[in-house]
Amino acid sequence: MKYRPNFSTTESTVNIPVIFAKVSGVKDGKVSEYWSSIRELITEDTMVIKSFPYIQPLAANPIKPYVTEFYKNGRLQKAKIKNHPAYAYGFLREEIQEHILDKLQILIEQKLIRGTFENGTEYTILSTILNLPKEILRMLQKFDFTKKNPKLIYINPGEKVISLEDAILTAFLNLAGFDILFFIPTGYQNIENFYNRKQMEEHQIGEYLYDLNVPDLTRVPLPKARQKSWRDILFRRE
């Protein structure tokens, strides 16, 4: 089996090298090449988000009324969560359920999200991560820790600010082993406002462009010639 570079285990902890990056601007202002470069990153284990918010804050969430029961004295109450009638992850592999809950504990205790333990944001974190969309759960279920990371690509060409729930999702998935890539042709700040400290690298690749329309990336042609680019900096570990 071919292991990903820098993959390791320490006792019962799996250490997964991941990317969390924001790519600002458009190289040389060439829009068609910009979309082609993003298209090149998409694999069968890639999810692309281009409409916001991805997680609707007011959408039905069966577990939300109960989350205050699930975090006591600085610890996630795993047994109580798993035995609760509203717990929806029982169909996942046991190791994936444990992985989700372990990373949820870390996300809260490290206070990665602004407002944690100050205004109840920890409960928003709990309700968000315990009610993940089906497509995310399917990606987690088939996650092989020893191979290449699944990717989440988030494209925001306009002025909409990412929601708190989407910021929680991306921070969690990065802890869980996903590569997270934000493509922001405008260069605007979006996700940064939700973090207590710098979480991601920013790569300025070119001039800022506005009001771009995201095409159907499955129909975008791949680059004709492979040249060294900002992608090599992002994925230098592969």
Where are these regions (language model features)?
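Conserved N-terminal ligand/cofactor-binding loop architecture of enzyme catalytic domains
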Residues: 1, 14-25, 32-127, 201-237
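Histidine-anchored nucleotide/phosphate-binding helix
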Residues: 3-8, 28-44, 163-179
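Phenylalanine-focused residue identity feature
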Residues: 7, 20, 52, 70, ...
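Short boundary motifs at domain starts and secondary-structure transition points
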Residues: 2-13, 136-147
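Short hydrophobic beta-strand segments
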Residues: 7-25, 148-157
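Active-site and donor-binding regions of nucleotide-sugar-utilizing enzymes
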Residues: 125-143, 150-194, 198, 202
